[in-house]
Amino acid sequence: MTALSEPRTRLLTRSFALVWALTFVTFFAAFQLFPTVPLRLRELGASLAESGRFMSLFTAGSAIGALFTGPLGDRVGHRRLVVTCALLYACFLGGYALLTSRWGFYLLAFPHGIVWSGLLTATMASLAHVLPEDRRADGLSLYGLASPGGVIVGPLLGLWIFQHGGFAPIGWYLAALFLLLGLLGTTLPADHPHGRAEGFKWPNAAVLAPCLVLFCVALGYGALGSYTAQEGLALGMPLPSAFLSFMAVGMVLMRIIMLKRGFGRRPIRKLPGMLVGAFAGMALLALLPGGMVRHMASALLYGAGYSMLHTLLNAKLLESVDPQRRGSAFGALLFAFDAGIGLGSFSLGWVIGHHGYRLGWGLGAVAMLAALPTALRLGKD
C-alpha cells in the first residue's frame, strides 16, 4: 500500500474543537470591546483623543506580557495557564461592566492585555498537543479561521448591544462566557511530562527569523486597523469599513482553498509567495485610483496573503522549536506582532496625518518588502 492510499489521521477531535472555540471567543470578545470601550469612555467624559488610550495600554500589556506568559506556560503547564487566564479574563470583563470612571478602564487595560497574551500563547501551545504531526499545516489552516471569524462577528454584535442596552450587558454576558470556557478548559489534554520546562527559558535563535517577518508585516497591519475606515469616511464611501470586511473575506477564502489543496511536505516554502501577495494588496491600496473598489480589491489580495503568514510561521515553530520552549516561542512571536502593530499605528499614523493616507499605505508595503529576504531564507531551510 502506498503512502497516498493510507487513511489520513483524524483532525476534527473534541480537543481541537475546544481549542478552536477558545480562540474564536477570545477574538469575539476582544473585538466587541475594542469598538465599544472608546464609546463608553466618551460617555464618561473622555475626549476623542483620550478614548484611544485604552487600546494603547492594552496592546502594551499584551506585547510585554507575551515575553513572560510564554515561558510561564512552559513551566506551569499550558492547560493550567489557559484555565487561569480564561477565569481572569472573566473577572476583567465583569469589572468593566461595573466601572463608572474612565480611569478604571485605563488601570485595568494593561493587566488585561497581559492576560490576553497569556491566553493566546497558552492556547496556541496547547494546539500542539491536539494536532496530529502529519496534519499540522491543515490543522493550523482550519484553526486560523477562528480569529477572523471572531473579528467579523464581534464588532457587529458588540455595537448592536451597546446601542440597544448600553455597555454593561456586554461585560456581563462575556464574563459568563469566559467562566464557562475556563471550566471547559480543564478538559483539555494534559501537558506531556517532557513539555514542562524546568525553569523559565527564553526562545532560541530559531524564533528570530519568524519574529522579524511578522514584525515587518505588523507595521503595516497596525495602520490598516486604525485608518482604513477613516479614509473610507473621508472619501464618503457607502461602506467605510470595506477594507476590513473584505480583508476577512480574503482570509477565509484563502484558508478554504489551502484546506482543499493541501500544503505539501514543507509548508514554509509557501511563505515568500504569501508575503508577496500581502505586499501587493497593500501596494494596490496605495497606488490604485478611486475609493470603494480600491479598498475591496486590495483587501481581498492582502487578506489572502496575510492570513497564511501566521499559519506558516506557526507551523515552522511547531516543527523547529523544542517542545519545552513552545510557550516562550509563541510568546516571542506575539510580542513581535503586537510591537509591530503599536509602532506601525503610531508611526504610520503620524505619516498619514501629515502627508496623507496613500503615503502611509506605501510605507507599510515597503516594510513588508523588507521582510522578503528573511522569508526567502526561511523557505529554503
Predicted regions and their residues:
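C-terminal membrane-cytosol helix-exit motif in multi-pass small-molecule transporters
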Residues: 175-193, 374-378
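Helix-to-loop junctions at the C-terminal end of transmembrane segments
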Residues: 66-77, 254-267
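Conserved MFS/SLC helix-loop-helix module at the cytosolic interface between two early adjacent transmembrane helices
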Residues: 64-96
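Helix-loop boundary and gating motifs at the non-cytosolic
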Residues: 14-44, 48-52, 221-231
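Paired small-residue
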Residues: 103-111, 293-301
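Residue-level signature of mid-helix packing/kink "hotspots" within the transmembrane helices
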Residues: 59-67, 151-152, 251-256, 342
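Cytoplasmic helix-loop-helix junction between adjacent transmembrane helices
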Residues: 110-146
